[in-house]
Protein backbone atom coordinates (compact mmCIF):
# COMPACT_ATOMS: atom_id res chain seq x y z
CA UNK A 1 0.00 0.00 0.00
CA UNK A 2 1.56 3.33 -1.04
CA UNK A 3 2.00 5.97 1.62
CA UNK A 4 2.31 9.70 0.98
CA UNK A 5 2.82 12.52 3.48
CA UNK A 6 0.09 15.13 3.07
CA UNK A 7 -0.97 17.77 5.60
CA UNK A 8 2.07 16.60 7.61
CA UNK A 9 0.63 13.12 8.17
CA UNK A 10 1.24 9.80 6.37
CA UNK A 11 -1.77 8.69 4.32
CA UNK A 12 -2.13 5.13 3.06
CA UNK A 13 -3.96 4.73 -0.22
CA UNK A 14 -4.45 2.25 -3.06
CA UNK A 15 -5.24 2.96 -6.72
CA UNK A 16 -6.93 0.23 -8.78
CA UNK A 17 -8.12 0.23 -12.39
CA UNK A 18 -8.15 2.99 -14.97
CA UNK A 19 -10.63 5.58 -16.16
CA UNK A 20 -12.38 8.48 -14.43
CA UNK A 21 -11.16 8.71 -10.84
CA UNK A 22 -13.39 7.70 -7.91
CA UNK A 23 -12.31 8.23 -4.30
CA UNK A 24 -14.01 6.03 -1.68
CA UNK A 25 -14.11 7.31 1.92
CA UNK A 26 -14.90 4.84 4.69
CA UNK A 27 -16.80 5.37 7.94
CA UNK A 28 -15.45 5.71 11.47
CA UNK A 29 -13.09 3.06 12.76
CA UNK A 30 -12.76 1.15 9.48
CA UNK A 31 -9.86 0.99 7.01
CA UNK A 32 -10.25 1.74 3.33
CA UNK A 33 -9.85 -1.93 2.42
CA UNK A 34 -13.43 -2.58 3.56
CA UNK A 35 -14.46 -1.30 0.11
CA UNK A 36 -12.38 -4.03 -1.57
CA UNK A 37 -14.92 -6.84 -1.18
CA UNK A 38 -17.69 -5.37 -3.30
CA UNK A 39 -17.38 -1.76 -4.42
CA UNK A 40 -13.83 -1.68 -5.78
CA UNK A 41 -14.22 -4.66 -8.16
CA UNK A 42 -17.59 -3.42 -9.44
CA UNK A 43 -16.36 0.12 -10.09
CA UNK A 44 -13.15 -1.07 -11.77
CA UNK A 45 -15.19 -3.39 -14.01
CA UNK A 46 -17.42 -0.42 -14.87
CA UNK A 47 -14.41 1.51 -16.16
CA UNK A 48 -13.24 3.64 -13.24
CA UNK A 49 -9.94 4.26 -11.51
CA UNK A 50 -10.76 3.58 -7.86
CA UNK A 51 -8.86 5.09 -4.96
CA UNK A 52 -9.27 3.87 -1.39
CA UNK A 53 -7.60 5.50 1.60
CA UNK A 54 -7.22 5.05 5.33
CA UNK A 55 -8.69 8.04 7.14
CA UNK A 56 -6.55 9.88 9.67
CA UNK A 57 -6.29 7.81 12.85
CA UNK A 58 -6.76 4.38 11.29
CA UNK A 59 -3.15 3.25 10.89
CA UNK A 60 -1.12 5.69 12.99
CA UNK A 61 -1.44 8.38 15.66
CA UNK A 62 0.07 11.31 13.76
CA UNK A 63 -2.19 14.36 13.77
CA UNK A 64 -5.04 12.79 15.74
CA UNK A 65 -5.18 15.28 18.63
CA UNK A 66 -8.28 17.43 18.23
CA UNK A 67 -8.97 15.95 14.80
CA UNK A 68 -12.15 16.98 13.01
CA UNK A 69 -14.30 16.16 10.01
CA UNK A 70 -12.72 19.21 8.37
CA UNK A 71 -9.29 17.57 8.85
CA UNK A 72 -10.47 14.38 7.15
CA UNK A 73 -11.88 16.41 4.26
CA UNK A 74 -8.59 18.29 3.95
CA UNK A 75 -6.74 14.96 3.83
CA UNK A 76 -9.05 13.72 1.06
CA UNK A 77 -8.56 16.97 -0.85
CA UNK A 78 -4.79 16.71 -0.55
CA UNK A 79 -4.86 13.13 -1.85
CA UNK A 80 -7.02 14.10 -4.83
CA UNK A 81 -4.58 16.90 -5.66
CA UNK A 82 -1.62 14.54 -5.22
CA UNK A 83 -3.19 12.14 -7.72
CA UNK A 84 -3.62 14.88 -10.28
CA UNK A 85 -7.01 16.43 -10.14
CA UNK A 86 -10.72 16.19 -9.47
CA UNK A 87 -12.57 12.97 -8.70
CA UNK A 88 -15.97 11.53 -8.09
CA UNK A 89 -16.20 11.08 -4.32
CA UNK A 90 -18.22 8.44 -2.45
CA UNK A 91 -18.48 8.12 1.31
CA UNK A 92 -20.47 6.14 3.83
CA UNK A 93 -21.49 7.13 7.37
CA UNK A 94 -18.72 9.38 8.73
CA UNK A 95 -17.20 9.19 5.25
CA UNK A 96 -20.35 10.71 3.78
CA UNK A 97 -19.96 13.68 6.12
CA UNK A 98 -16.41 14.03 4.89
CA UNK A 99 -17.81 14.09 1.34
CA UNK A 100 -20.19 16.87 2.39
CA UNK A 101 -17.34 18.91 3.85
CA UNK A 102 -15.17 18.33 0.80
CA UNK A 103 -17.95 19.33 -1.61
CA UNK A 104 -18.61 22.51 0.42
CA UNK A 105 -15.02 23.63 0.94
CA UNK A 106 -13.25 22.32 -2.18
CA UNK A 107 -15.92 22.18 -4.90
CA UNK A 108 -13.33 22.27 -7.69
CA UNK A 109 -12.12 18.81 -6.63
CA UNK A 110 -15.50 17.04 -6.63
CA UNK A 111 -16.97 15.95 -9.97
CA UNK A 112 -19.94 14.06 -8.50
CA UNK A 113 -20.73 13.29 -4.86
CA UNK A 114 -22.41 10.18 -3.47
CA UNK A 115 -23.36 9.96 0.20
CA UNK A 116 -24.40 6.64 1.74
CA UNK A 117 -26.06 6.41 5.17
CA UNK A 118 -25.64 10.11 5.76
CA UNK A 119 -26.93 12.86 8.00
CA UNK A 120 -26.58 16.62 8.04
CA UNK A 121 -27.17 17.14 11.73
CA UNK A 122 -26.61 15.32 15.03
CA UNK A 123 -28.73 12.20 15.56
CA UNK A 124 -29.43 11.31 19.24
CA UNK A 125 -28.78 7.56 18.98
CA UNK A 126 -25.43 7.98 17.24
CA UNK A 127 -24.46 10.74 19.67
CA UNK A 128 -25.34 8.60 22.70
CA UNK A 129 -23.34 5.66 21.37
CA UNK A 130 -20.31 7.85 20.76
CA UNK A 131 -20.52 9.25 24.29
CA UNK A 132 -20.80 5.73 25.67
CA UNK A 133 -17.77 4.57 23.70
CA UNK A 134 -15.77 7.53 24.93
CA UNK A 135 -16.76 6.77 28.53
CA UNK A 136 -15.54 3.19 28.12
CA UNK A 137 -12.27 4.45 26.63
CA UNK A 138 -11.69 6.90 29.48
CA UNK A 139 -12.35 4.11 31.98
CA UNK A 140 -9.82 1.88 30.24
CA UNK A 141 -12.47 -0.72 29.39
CA UNK A 142 -12.25 -2.86 26.25
CA UNK A 143 -15.30 -5.05 25.73
CA UNK A 144 -14.85 -8.70 24.66
CA UNK A 145 -14.72 -9.04 20.84
CA UNK A 146 -17.68 -11.47 20.83
CA UNK A 147 -19.85 -8.94 22.67
CA UNK A 148 -18.69 -6.08 20.45
CA UNK A 149 -19.54 -8.21 17.42
CA UNK A 150 -23.06 -8.87 18.70
CA UNK A 151 -23.66 -5.16 19.34
CA UNK A 152 -22.33 -4.20 15.91
CA UNK A 153 -24.51 -6.78 14.19
CA UNK A 154 -27.63 -5.56 15.98
CA UNK A 155 -26.87 -1.90 15.28
CA UNK A 156 -25.71 -2.11 11.69
CA UNK A 157 -27.56 -4.95 9.95
CA UNK A 158 -31.17 -5.44 8.92
CA UNK A 159 -33.61 -7.61 10.90
CA UNK A 160 -34.25 -9.45 7.63
CA UNK A 161 -30.59 -10.45 7.45
CA UNK A 162 -30.51 -11.51 11.09
CA UNK A 163 -33.72 -13.55 10.78
CA UNK A 164 -31.62 -16.25 9.10
CA UNK A 165 -29.60 -17.94 11.91
CA UNK A 166 -26.88 -19.10 9.52
CA UNK A 167 -26.39 -15.62 8.06
CA UNK A 168 -26.50 -14.10 11.54
CA UNK A 169 -23.73 -16.44 12.70
CA UNK A 170 -21.64 -15.69 9.62
CA UNK A 171 -21.86 -11.97 10.33
CA UNK A 172 -21.05 -12.50 14.00
CA UNK A 173 -17.96 -14.47 13.02
CA UNK A 174 -16.86 -11.75 10.59
CA UNK A 175 -17.30 -8.97 13.13
CA UNK A 176 -15.62 -10.89 15.93
CA UNK A 177 -12.67 -11.88 13.74
CA UNK A 178 -12.15 -8.29 12.59
CA UNK A 179 -12.67 -6.65 15.99
CA UNK A 180 -9.45 -5.39 17.61
CA UNK A 181 -8.76 -6.60 21.14
CA UNK A 182 -8.06 -3.00 22.18
CA UNK A 183 -9.25 0.27 20.68
CA UNK A 184 -6.39 2.24 19.16
CA UNK A 185 -5.78 5.90 20.06
CA UNK A 186 -6.59 6.87 16.48
CA UNK A 187 -10.00 5.23 16.51
CA UNK A 188 -10.67 6.76 19.92
CA UNK A 189 -9.87 10.14 18.38
CA UNK A 190 -12.29 9.47 15.52
CA UNK A 191 -15.01 8.57 18.02
CA UNK A 192 -14.35 11.76 19.97
CA UNK A 193 -14.64 14.08 16.96
CA UNK A 194 -17.22 16.84 17.29
CA UNK A 195 -20.35 15.91 15.34
CA UNK A 196 -22.62 18.47 17.01
CA UNK A 197 -22.79 20.94 14.15
CA UNK A 198 -26.00 21.16 12.11
CA UNK A 199 -24.70 21.32 8.52
CA UNK A 200 -28.04 21.25 6.69
CA UNK A 201 -28.11 24.95 5.81
CA UNK A 202 -24.53 24.81 4.50
CA UNK A 203 -25.37 21.95 2.13
CA UNK A 204 -27.18 24.43 -0.13
CA UNK A 205 -23.75 25.60 -1.35
CA UNK A 206 -22.83 22.21 -2.82
CA UNK A 207 -22.46 22.50 -6.59
CA UNK A 208 -21.54 18.93 -7.53
CA UNK A 209 -24.28 16.62 -8.83
CA UNK A 210 -25.17 14.59 -5.76
CA UNK A 211 -26.78 11.24 -5.01
CA UNK A 212 -27.87 10.39 -1.47
CA UNK A 213 -28.53 6.72 -0.70
CA UNK A 214 -30.49 5.69 2.38
CA UNK A 215 -30.85 2.19 3.82
CA UNK A 216 -34.36 1.24 4.91
CA UNK A 217 -33.42 -0.46 8.20
CA UNK A 218 -30.59 1.89 9.19
CA UNK A 219 -30.70 2.47 12.96
CA UNK A 220 -27.60 4.68 13.08
CA UNK A 221 -28.64 7.18 10.40
CA UNK A 222 -32.31 6.52 9.58
CA UNK A 223 -33.44 7.22 6.01
CA UNK A 224 -35.19 10.40 7.15
CA UNK A 225 -31.72 11.86 7.78
CA UNK A 226 -30.64 11.18 4.21
CA UNK A 227 -33.89 12.57 2.83
CA UNK A 228 -33.17 15.83 4.68
CA UNK A 229 -29.67 15.96 3.24
CA UNK A 230 -30.90 15.42 -0.31
CA UNK A 231 -33.56 18.10 0.12
CA UNK A 232 -30.91 20.57 1.30
CA UNK A 233 -28.60 20.10 -1.71
CA UNK A 234 -29.74 21.77 -4.94
CA UNK A 235 -30.68 19.14 -7.52
CA UNK A 236 -29.66 16.17 -5.36
CA UNK A 237 -31.23 12.77 -5.97
CA UNK A 238 -32.35 10.42 -3.19
CA UNK A 239 -32.65 6.65 -3.53
CA UNK A 240 -33.49 4.17 -0.79
CA UNK A 241 -32.55 0.51 -0.60
CA UNK A 242 -34.83 -1.60 1.57
CA UNK A 243 -34.06 -4.54 3.88
CA UNK A 244 -30.57 -3.42 4.81
CA UNK A 245 -29.05 -1.52 7.70
CA UNK A 246 -26.23 0.96 8.21
CA UNK A 247 -23.83 -1.42 6.45
CA UNK A 248 -26.07 -1.63 3.39
CA UNK A 249 -23.06 -1.49 1.07
CA UNK A 250 -22.10 -4.89 2.52
CA UNK A 251 -25.62 -6.33 2.95
CA UNK A 252 -26.97 -5.28 -0.47
CA UNK A 253 -23.83 -4.68 -2.53
CA UNK A 254 -25.40 -5.40 -5.92
CA UNK A 255 -28.13 -2.81 -5.37
CA UNK A 256 -25.65 -0.26 -4.02
CA UNK A 257 -23.19 -0.82 -6.85
CA UNK A 258 -25.93 -0.52 -9.47
CA UNK A 259 -26.83 2.92 -8.10
CA UNK A 260 -23.21 4.08 -7.88
CA UNK A 261 -22.35 3.04 -11.41
CA UNK A 262 -25.54 4.37 -13.00
CA UNK A 263 -25.15 7.75 -11.32
CA UNK A 264 -21.46 8.09 -12.15
CA UNK A 265 -22.08 7.14 -15.78
CA UNK A 266 -25.04 9.50 -16.02
CA UNK A 267 -27.50 6.70 -16.74
CA UNK A 268 -31.07 6.48 -15.37
CA UNK A 269 -31.03 5.22 -11.80
CA UNK A 270 -32.48 1.74 -11.21
CA UNK A 271 -35.80 1.83 -9.40
CA UNK A 272 -36.18 -1.85 -8.46
CA UNK A 273 -33.64 -2.35 -5.68
Model-derived features: where do they sit?
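Short glycine-enriched nucleophile-adjacent loop
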Residues: 96-107, 113
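Conserved alpha/beta-hydrolase catalytic His-Asp/Glu region
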Residues: 146-197, 201-202
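Acidic catalytic loop of the alpha/beta-hydrolase fold
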Residues: 217-221
Amino acid sequence: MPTVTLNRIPINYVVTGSGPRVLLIMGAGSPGRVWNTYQVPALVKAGFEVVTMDNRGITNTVGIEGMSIADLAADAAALIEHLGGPAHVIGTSLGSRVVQELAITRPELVVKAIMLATTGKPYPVESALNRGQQALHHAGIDLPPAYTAAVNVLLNLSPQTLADPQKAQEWLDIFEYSAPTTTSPGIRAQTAMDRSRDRLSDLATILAPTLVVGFGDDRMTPPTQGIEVAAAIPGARYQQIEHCGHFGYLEKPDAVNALLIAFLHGHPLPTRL
